[in-house]
Amino acid sequence: AKVGDNLAHHELDICDASKLAAIVQQAKPEIVLHLAAQALVRESYSDPLRTFSVNVMGTANVLDALRHCDSVRSIVVVTTDKVYANQEWIWPYRETDRLGGHDPYSASKTGTEIVVASYRSSFFAAKGVTVATARAGNVIGGGDWSADRIIPDAVRAWSANETLQVRRPQAVRPWQHVIEPLCAYLVLAERAWSDATAAKAWNFGPQTHEAATVREVVGIAQAAFGQGQVQWGDGKDGPHEAGLLMLDTSLAKSQLGVQSVF
């Protein structure tokens, strides 16, 4: 498709502020989507300092480099649905609900939100740069082979004729195909280009009634795979993970025209 013909590709650690700033000055971007992160909850327990370093200070480095770049007009920072102070209740969380973070990953992403809010009000607003955050539900899709992701874990286990270990089968999550939030990020970035009121947090995910338990998702995967043994846990072992999490996505639907399709 020759997609790469018009792309400049650089790989670097966002914790390296000087290299990051140099790349930004070289690229002179107009629209920025910031997705770099340490994105695994369980890894955040084993290495919390790296998680905070990448997600909080790494984001600060990105934003600080961008505030010195006059070409920038639209910035979308992707955080997570886990930034909310989870009450384990049946109501979906709205963008204005209280933030929190029981585990290091969630806390680091809440810190990201605070860093964004500070840079937005302190530096970007006066320059006419719109900075938004995107809070997406659990994503499923090709290319993700990270550990502790339910579908990749299932494929690895069943392909090797092994039993899939499921820690919390009754946990409820706002599952969505990866194409959905990616499209939403692009819509948000486009809106932020021309509309300063987009400078806020946005939830992206399925409708509330489409949220499903881990057991239900594994059942669908089993049917698609055609086989596969599962060992169901009771959620008592291992570090804390939220049991019930849903998002209110009515803001994105009403103001951006974004809603789940798949």
What are these regions (language model features)?
Residues 1-31:
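N-terminal Rossmann/SDR dinucleotide-binding element
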Residues 13, 158-262:
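C-terminal substrate-binding subdomain of Rossmann-fold SDR/epimerase-dehydratase oxidoreductases
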Residues 2-9, 126-129, 226-229:
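A short helix-to-beta-strand connector/capping loop
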